[in-house]
Amino acid sequence: MTPRLRRRGALLVSVLASVVLLSSCGGQTAATPHQQQAQAHVDVDTAALRAIKQRAGVEACPTPEGHGPVRGGMPAVTLPCLGGGNPVDLAKLRGPLVVNLFAQWCGPCRAELPYYQKLHEQGRGKVAVLGIDYQDTLPAGALQLAKATGVTYPLLADPTAQLRVPFRVRGLPGVVLVDAHGRVVHEELTEVGSYQQLRQMVQRYLHVAL
């Protein structure tokens, strides 16, 4: 093999390794200035989005009142309700609560959404479920995904990735569990592989049997 061919072969191996590494990432990388500007102008409350939300049957966002931030609780970040509704101060949320970080561009998220919906249905009155559409510039796509997968639990939007630092988000999907006192008792960036896995997580960390 000539030196030129060896160099080409080494370059090809390097490129292929980079492709494999990127394909294994669960989420988007840090946004460029152009992407950040686009994310900052994402409107998550329009007449069209409200119509999609209504057709999908997505419930209204929670309105936590009378609570303040707690040590070890959710971050003091206020997010808009996807498809219209009251914004929510995450620091005021109380559980038992399961928060799902997802996006319409995330393949694994699509697969696990039905498990969260089943938890929403079977855990009604015992544990609440809340979705957060993370770093997503296509809110209509997120609501259409909710409709396609049967999701009806409340959905917030974080198009500018305000939760990147508090939750150390490097990829999606993610799950956060909040107890009755508002404390985050468990968080991980992982795909839930089954409803059984999600149910066991709720029982272990929130002490709620379903």
Language-model segment annotations:
Residues S14-S24, P96-L97, Y115, I132-Y134, ...:
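Hydrophobic alpha-helical membrane segments, chiefly transmembrane helices and signal peptide h-regions
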Residues G95, K126-V127, T152-Y153:
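A generic structural signal for alpha->beta connector loops
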Residues R110-T149, P159-V165:
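Structural microenvironment flanking redox-active thiols in thiol-disulfide oxidoreductases
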